[in-house]
Amino acid sequence: DDSLREQAVLIEKELERRGRIDRIDTQGMADPEIRVEFDATRIAALGLSPSDVATTVQTYFQDLAAGELDVAGSNWLVRLKGKSTDAFDLNRFPILGRDGSLRVGDVARVTRTQAERSELVRYEGKPSVLLAVMKAEGANTLELIDEVKDYIETHNELEAVTGTRLVLIDDQTIPTRKALNIMQNNALIGLMLVLVVAWIFLGLKIATLTAIGIPFILAGTFWILQGMDQTLNVTVLLGVVIALGMLVDDAVVVVEAIYYRVERGFSGIDAVLDALKETVAPVTAAVLTTVAAFLPLMLLPGILGKFMMVIPLVVSVALLISLVEAFWMLPGHVLGAGMKLDRDGKTQQFRTRLNRGIRHVYMRLLIRALRRPFTTLAISVCALFGAVGLLASGQIRADFFASDPIRVFYVNIETEPGTRLERTLNLTLEIEKVVRANLGEGEARGVVAYAGQQFTETEPLRGSHRGQVLVGLQPDGREVTDIINEMRESVRAVPGPSRVTFLELAGGPPSSKPISIKVRGSDFSELRAAADEIRNILHNTAGVKDVSDDAQDGRFALQLTLDPDQVARSGLLPADIARNIRILVDGEIVESVQDQGETVDIRVVAADGQFSSPTQLLGAQLPTATGDMISLSELVNADRSPTFGTIRHYNFRRTITVEADIDSEITDTVTSNQSVMEAWGQLQASYPTVNLDFSGELDDIQESLDSIGILFIFGLGVMYLILGTQFKSFGQPLLILVTVPLAFTGVVLGLFVTGNPLSLYTLYGVVALSGIAVNSAIVMISAANDRLIAGMGLKHATLYAARRRVVPIVITVLTTIAGLFSLAAGLGGTSLIWGPVATAIVWGLGFSSVLTLFVVPLLYYLTGRRREIRLNSGT
């Protein structure tokens, strides 16, 4: 153990010298200690008390600065030195109050050893030390773990010399690397799809000119983010993926307008200037409305808000920079390249036929819609109500905190309070054997068993009756949930532990348990009974698993109170009696000394094995003021009784928190909590002083839903103000915002078709989508208004704007969808966190754009007709 500890300390120091590491937390490593262990019976026979031994050591074993001495004009420091790192020096100290013939070594055994352990760790059955490496602020996590791996490899080459081997049990960068790879792959695929769409509709040269601004936009975005102390992480990459398709939207609209004019014989400079005149206002309004939808999401409170705050920042910065690229750099590129149509080959002929075909088919359908306006509107309304019906009927599965699992899980073991640490460790090792038997060959990177501590999702729990098995899995293999379900029954069949639960970690923002119920009351026995009822309810609720609570049964205690009369007659001071009791039971740290950078405590304590029962302790003898001996039982009143364990309070009342996990394939957070509420309603009368507070993930969901709703309304309000300023109208912004419920319809349809759950990330995507979906309507209504100002009739202007804008709308919608399609479909890797955001935008934008092409012109025409009729009747 000493050599293991020395190696662990050496490794800890070597790692901490590296700049990327903030600190290293150790587990299973006891502190060094010098113990002065006396025989209580022997010192009593010599007329000594435990405090005599402790005071002797404390008095001699000290360093004292006595001041300065003036010696021939120089100041000399005067120090009294008594401390030593040699444990045997303590043996020579004479017991105070004696003639010097009796020394510490005559009544006690002095040894250099280790403090009593509060934790025991085993790896493959061998004593081990766990070292948890914490990175310094701003350090690159991936570089740090690579550095640690190199250190492990170098250290293990010297295993024959050091006698120790390092094993990496838990690598938290594995999910990070996986997520980064998913984002990078999907970003690359998305970029390629964007270029393909632009090439199909606009040709290679124009597609290249459109895409050439993307590196500039991303470089500017990353430069600004670096100035704001942001790092490149998964959420930043998600913002890039979301923005990727939209980055070329501005350029597509501008370059399509230029392309349209070149087709009609405009010169290069005239085509650019006329196109900019037409597109600056609507494109700027479209970008600002998108920013208005995204930016308020930075104000989202709670865990979800902190985790995803950077996404709207990335998207907003990138979109604003894209305006600079579209209105300044792109026209320069176009003029420099000499905007000409591609050669009149088969590809260009196909492109021309495609654009004309889209306009022709669209105009035929739009004219039919204008002839049957109420049928078209009825279809849209029915689609909206159908989406609401799918949600209300439960056809869309809800999993508000859907997350990607981490390849690590824990098996938690609890025994009866007061169980010795060694006994708990032995039971934990039995559990470890069963766990290993249920794992495939090479499936685990490492399995560690330890007692005295349990890691949780929030804070570690300590106690000699707690044990835990940590299982680190290989990056690829069976799902963590499947592994746990397969071994659950066999692990729980191991005799001995009073409770066995599993803890499965998940990626994404930290979240509470799906079920977390605070049982509050004043009477502890009634509170305990009510908590047991809640546990029974949860055990009988479908889809609920790993039920636990934080109530701790107390251990038996020997309660001692001083007898004032007896204490007075003995002539002993109460403080001296209390000190002697502490020295007899747990010992007293009388001093400490520094040795090679470590603090070594000096503990005076009765030798082990002297007090195996309360009776033996109470029989300990203490010398009185007259020199007579008196037993401890004569000085104190003793009461043997059970005690309460940890008693927690919430809002000034005693509280037991009952928690459980759920199988999201069977139930969801809201449904399972509702089941408990209904079952408790039938039992509540039996527990009049007890009430329940439902918190945990339910609180997080409610907070996020409330906040997302408020920010959604706020974003719509800002969008309305921007559109009102752009169009100088109160009514036309409302026509544009009609696209938002249409987008919601598409999101619900997408969830239903793909089988994805409704999560808070999906709702996040819906709010973001509200700013994207309006862009098509903006450019269409802007074109119609321009035609009206130019003197066209209402119907002619509506049809002209629709025909003129349908191709750029199709292109921008397809490029946005193309940028996110890979992430939504999982082409470059799947994610339960980011996939729903992309799915919401892809389906919502696709569905709303189709309806927008018909509903917006129709509403524009109908409201315009109504205004004309009102004006004519007024005249």
Feature locations, PLM:
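Extracytoplasmic/periplasmic
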Residues: 2-30, 52, 398-472, 486-489, ...
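Helix-loop junctions and hydrophobic alpha-helical segments within the transmembrane domains
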Residues: 169, 176, 180, 255, ...
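Transmembrane alpha-helices and their membrane-interface boundaries in multi-pass membrane transporters
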Residues: 244-258, 279-299, 306-348, 469, ...
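Transmembrane helices with small-residue packing motifs
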Residues: 230, 298-306, 381-419, 478, ...
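Signature of alpha-helical transmembrane segments and their immediate interfacial
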Residues: 279, 348-399, 517, 803
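Hydrophobic transmembrane alpha-helices and their membrane-interface caps
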Residues: 192-260, 317, 718-805, 810-826, ...
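Solvent-exposed, membrane-proximal periplasmic/extracellular interface segments of envelope transport
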Residues: 41-62, 66, 81-83, 422-510, ...
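Extracytoplasmic/periplasmic membrane-proximal domains and adjacent transmembrane bundles
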Residues: 12-189, 199, 255, 535-715, ...
